[in-house]
Each structure stands twice: as structure tokens, then as C-alpha cells.
């Protein structure tokens, strides 16, 4: 998840785009599997799906959002979308919720009182490949 995602620019069919809230998503029905986005992503965040769906469509939860409740067909690209079906309902992404050590954090960086804003203010924070200008939304920190 980048503020200026190179993957969006290279998709020839606009199957990947940035939502108004900044989340980069993929529509698996539009994706033609050209893998241009995989080549453009400097973080290796894109994955090509070599397998057929493991879960039949009828087993999917009908209460989830359109972009997050789709069987990922063989031959399309996939990526993390911060579990937008969860975050838009006020929940944490699944990886944050189940992290056994609590080391994953998620929140509104624009809210100065949020946990993530406090971490950025008080910890030694860095982002990967900052020099590329993609402005990734993943921050890494450690205590000093």
C-alpha cells in the first residue's frame, strides 16, 4: 500500500486502482494476469495466482464487500488490501487482529491521538525504500 503506487500506473486494463481512502485494490474479474504490476512493485507485494480457487463461490460470505469476497481465479494478480471489508466496518485487518505478539498495528495516521500516530511520534520509525518516492504506508519501528 503506497500513497503513489507504481502498480496502478502500469495496469493496461485498469484492474488495479487506488480508492478514495488510499487503499490500492484489484478487481480479479478485470485482471488479465499480465504481471506488469508485479514488475512495477519494488516491495514484491504482488503475487500471481497459479492455482484454481480453493473455495467454491457458494461458500463465500455474502455479507462481505464486492472487492474482498471474490474467488481469486487462476492467472490473476493478488495483493493485500488491508482487509477493506473489515476496516471499512471499523475492524482491524485480519493479520493485526490475530497477531500473537501484538507487533502489528493499524490505525488512522491523521488522528494525532491514535496508537499509530503515537508510535510514529515516539519510536524510531522507518519505511522501506523511501528513496523511491512511493510513500509506502507500512512503517517499521523499534525501541531505542
Residues of each region from the PLM?
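Non-ligating segments of multi-cofactor redox enzymes
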Residues: 1-144
